[in-house]
Swiss-Prot record:
Protein name listed in UniProt: Uncharacterized N-acetyltransferase DDB_G0290199
Family matches, as PANTHER family: FAMILY N-ACETYLTRANSFERASE, PUTATIVE (AFU_ORTHOLOGUE AFUA_2G01380)-RELATED
UniProt-listed Pfam families: Acetyltransf_1
InterPro entries: Acetyltransferase_Enz, Acyl_CoA_acyltransferase, GNAT_dom
Molecular function via GO: acyltransferase activity, transferring groups other than amino-acyl groups
Entry EC number(s): 2.3.1.-
Organism: Dictyostelium discoideum (Social amoeba)
Annotated family: Belongs to the acetyltransferase family.
């Protein structure tokens, strides 16, 4: 048994065969992902011109599986916890006059508010810069025909895609998969994927696991 992974940009008919089987196997309505548009415009977002990738796998000469990669415009916040501002504790000057004390308190409050506003502005700027600088891709349509499962074809497809994403200078790779697909999830995690929050609207989000992989 020889497994061969090849570029599929000129093999759209074969990709469509696999995509159809993939949807039938999932048994889920993918209209919320605009699947029909994706299907009819192949290779579309998976094309090299769009910073994508599209592969099919053969077992000997038999069509066995597929996978795609496409660029996605989302933001991944590397710092989950918001940083707190460390304010210097100034020694309290004892002032006998109540008016002076009130003025000092008001000034301190104003300074704290200004510091908080500055910090918020800095955080917003950092997030905007991070979003502009981040290059993120999404793994889609990983599928292996039932008669070829157990031959590590899925793992080979994932490995190929990750290597390509690194060569394309992507910062992160993300994906979503059904929680019931435990074998697929174990493969993803073996490559270093970790779970994180949903990155797009999915009506089946309670049944879906969202994963990300830092590539740099």
């Amino acid at each position: 048994m020889v497994v061969k992974i090849v570029e599929a940009y000129e093999k759209v008919d074969q990709v469509k065969i696999l995509f159809k089987e993939y949807v039938e196997w999932l048994n889920i309505d993918l209209s919320f992902q605009n699947f029909s548009e994706e299907f009819n415009s192949l290779p579309g977002k998976y094309s090299i011109e769009n910073d994508g990738r599209l592969y099919i796998a053969y077992s000997d000469e038999s069509l066995a599986g597929c996978v795609g990669l496409r660029k996605i415009n989302i933001e991944i916040n590397e710092n989950k916890n918001n940083q707190q501002v460390d304010h210097d504790e100034t020694s309290t000057i004892i002032i006998k006059k109540e008016q002076q004390q009130q003025q000092q308190q008001q000034q301190q409050q104003q300074q704290q508010q200004q510091q908080q506003q500055q910090q918020q502005q800095q955080q917003q700027q950092q997030q905007q810069q991070q979003q502009q600088q981040q290059k993120i891709c999404e793994m889609k349509r990983l599928f292996v025909k039932s008669e070829f499962r157990g031959l590590k074809i899925g793992k080979l497809l994932v490995e190929r895609l990750i290597n390509d994403a690194k060569e394309q200078n992507y910062d992160y790779m993300v994906l979503d998969t059904l929680k019931t697909l435990t074998t697929a999830i174990s493969i993803y995690k073996s490559f270093g994927f970790i779970e994180f929050d949903p990155y797009y609207y999915n009506p089946n989000s309670n049944d879906v696991t969202f994963l990300k992989l830092k590539l740099k």
